[in-house]
Amino acid sequence: PEMSRGLGDVYKRQTLYNYRMPEPHRSTIDYHLYNSNEYVIFNPDIRYVDGYPGESCYNCLMPGITMMIAKGYIDEKGIGAQGHSWGGYQVAYLATRTNLFSAIESGAPVVNMFSAYGGIRWGSGMARSFQYEHTQSRLGATPWSSPLRYLENSPLFTMDKVQTPILIMHNDADGHVPWYQGIEYFVAMKRLGKPCWLLNY
């Protein structure tokens, strides 16, 4: 039988018992649409090591994809990845670590943890530093105490390694992920001559 294409949808931890209605979603792929068009959807659970969120994603995702290729479930020449917000960051990081994907859609990603750390959430005015030190990003330190940790986890500084075409989707009214992160991503990719598109939605 002909192999299917694969699409990874990356965020954090998922649940086996969560049914997604066949309807448009605001920031994730339509599983039913892709599956009915012969895509295998891989939605991995990411187990994080504090201080290494990007590498944690890579270490959880890649063995699963490698296994699906080895078992003939997916065609290694037809694999894409999608993520939004935290997932957008993770697929941006993945693009700097592997050329396995044929295309990546990175929605509302953070690519520079230094500049994002110093920002605020526009709607509330809350400083964004908390999420880099203690919550979602799990860096466990400030950029002054552990600058290398921020550097290693910021895709912006290793974009010269990217070979995958990337679609960046962002929103200039996003109150959570700074719009300028999408701009930094796009400008860096274009400056490096990488295939990249930016949609402001």
Stretches found by the model and what they are:
Residues P1-Y11:
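Single conserved hydrophobic/aromatic residue that forms the stacking wall/gate
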Residues D9, Q14-Y201:
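Active-site-proximal cap/loop segments of hydrolase catalytic domains
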